[in-house]
Amino acid sequence: MTITVNTNVSAMTAQRYLNKATGELNTSMERLSSGNKINSAKDDAAGLQISNRLTAQSRGLDVAMRNANDGISIAQTAEGAMNESTSILQRMRDLALQSANGTNSASERQALDEESTALQDELNRIAETTSFGGRKLLNGSFGEASFQIGASSGEAIIMGLTSIRADDFRMGGQSFLAEQGKDKDWGVPAGARDLKFEFTTQAGELVTLDVLAKDGDDIEELATYINGQTDKLKASVDQDGKLQIFAAEPNLQGDLAISGGLATELGLNGGPGVKTTVQDIDITSVGGSQNAVGVLDAALRYVDSQRAELGAKQNRLSHSINNLANIQENVEASNSRIKDTDFAKETTQMTKAQILQQAGTSILAQAKQLPNSAMSLLQ
């Protein structure tokens, strides 16, 4: 073994290994104290990029779940108000049926109409005051809203809310009134029993209804027979014996064409009907009460269709939240395997580094004494 003074190779080697052990110890302590296996790009450049992408995805999924829950909250708020509106419409229908009874006096019908009018006002109040986060939901101003339910752009669903005010055109339809009233002794003529209705629905479907009335039926029996042939139209008779036809708004686009021998007999002509909504109903007369039932039935169907759509949206959002939670769980698990510290493994590494550091320190101290042996040769 060569003994030198200017260059202590043994000390240099011991120093190098001591520095390595110290660096490994510092890295282990950093990982254990932070809980992260990757604390800078030098630890794992590729792993850091993947981890950051997974973190962004996970945070996006978390926000998406909050957005979906907001959507459910809006739908629940609107649906709750619609539920109360349905109860109001049901009560108004009861009042209309009660008023249509022939035993009622004019004053009794007036009292029933006053309650019906008060319920109309409450229906409008609910529509105008139901809100979520400052946005009105049921007065027609909400329109459509997009709910971001994914971690990336474009992953959204659209939810729309429409007006349920008593004067909204969808809360009713069109009314048609025959010109000729018929008394109890009138019967359907044998040679004029045919009645034909033609109209186009809002969906663009051309509908033709052919009704062949029974010979000798009176005007009330005729209305009952028409109602039994179709649910597209509602027939009733007013106090003057005039046949009334009501078509709900979703079932009618444009004019209603009415033809046939019976149409001529009754003076029932098609054409622009009278726009009739819940706001317009008047149950102070038998005819108005009868027609009001058809209007309210149309309004109930409209509100029910809106509630059904909201229910479907709620179910969709609930399933979306469940799916997002499952995706987030798997993304977090993947990110954990890449980024998080394995404490069992890292503790072992730290113990190893501590032992090597202590050994390196001891060996370096001994290596520094080697040049001193040259002095003994000079004595």
From Swiss-Prot:
Pfam family, one: Flagellin_C
One GO term describing the cellular component: extracellular region
Domain of life from the UniProt record: Bacteria
Molecular function as annotated in GO: structural molecule activity
Protein location: Secreted; Bacterial flagellum
InterPro entries xref list: Flagellin, Flagellin_C, Flagellin_C_sub2, Flagellin_hook_IN_motif, Flagellin_N
Coiled-coil intervals, chain numbering: 103-128, 302-341
Keywords recorded for this protein, A-Z: Bacterial flagellum, Coiled coil, Secreted, Virulence
Main localization, broad class: secreted
Function per UniProt: Flagellin is the subunit protein which polymerizes to form the filaments of bacterial flagella. FlaA is essential for flagellar synthesis and full motility. Important for virulence at two different levels: is needed for crossing the fish integument and may play a role once the bacterium has entered the host.
Family: Belongs to the bacterial flagellin family.
Subunit field text: Heteromer of multiple flagellin subunits including FlaA, FlaB, FlaC, FlaD and possibly FlaE.
This protein's name: Flagellin A
Organism of derivation: Vibrio anguillarum (Listonella anguillarum)
